Amino acid sequence: MTKEIILISTLILKNIGIRKILITLSYLKRIKLILYILKHVGIKTKKFIEIGIENGSECNTTNLLKNFGWSGLQIEGNEKFYQNAKIKIKEILGKKIKNLKLLNVFVTKKNINHILRKNAFNKEIDLLSIDIDGNDFWIWKAIRYIKPRIVIIEYNSFFGPNKSATIKYNPKFKWDHQNKRPYYGASLKALEKLGKKKKYSLVGVDKNGVNAFFIRNDLARKINLKSKKVKDIYLNNVREARDIKKYQYECKKLLNQK
């Protein structure tokens, strides 16, 4: 584990409960994977956009802000999460908070490109991360204004490795956090197909079966990295229990993606 990861993990582990230790360790593994990919793809702008951060302490870009001199935009649509994030991220970043713009806005297909233009991002950024437990697929599909070098996006392992499906687009969709319904997001296969259409290569997933990693095709070719097949890399979300009755019920509402 690198010195930089240890630095941020110390801040995160402060005042943490025992029940959250495993979650935090999985977060640190994900951060290490991000650094590994950046090492091979290279860094050009040190700019990022992250959509969906909860309280900001375990999102994908705070470490880049804290320890590597990056700057960018974090967006959180949930008002409660946003207010917590303002406090947590300031504790983590200190003076480096000046390099972050934090927005409280509910992202939709209609407003996403306007948000990006309004915040004056160049078309090429190093990293885009999407984790909103809902319209992730539809937001990535709608983005036209930027061409990130790397995309990290949440997939729903509940839908399995073979089904290419998403939830139906609803601009007001909010995941039922309390009951943890499996109806949210998109399958890994659906995201793989979308990535191909947008000229991105699926290169891997994290060990928790939550996040998929994509690299822009022109960069993947430069480092001789071939796209992975879903069947070879698919992993289940280890923290979510499976209820076959729930699964069968939710599957009836899914939208197949070709």
Predicted regions and their residues:
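A short acidic (Asp/Glu
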Residues: 58-62, 84-85, 138-142, 163-164, ...
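Active-site segment flanking the S-adenosylmethionine/decSAM binding pocket
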Residues: 47-55, 101-174
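Rossmann-like AdoMet/SAM-dependent catalytic core
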Residues: 3-42, 49, 115, 162-258
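Short, structured coil segments at secondary-structure junctions
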Residues: 67-68, 146-147, 198
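SAM cofactor-binding core of SAM-dependent methyltransferases
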Residues: 22-118, 130
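Residue-level detector of short, conserved catalytic/binding motifs and their immediate flanks
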Residues: 62, 70, 149, 210-212
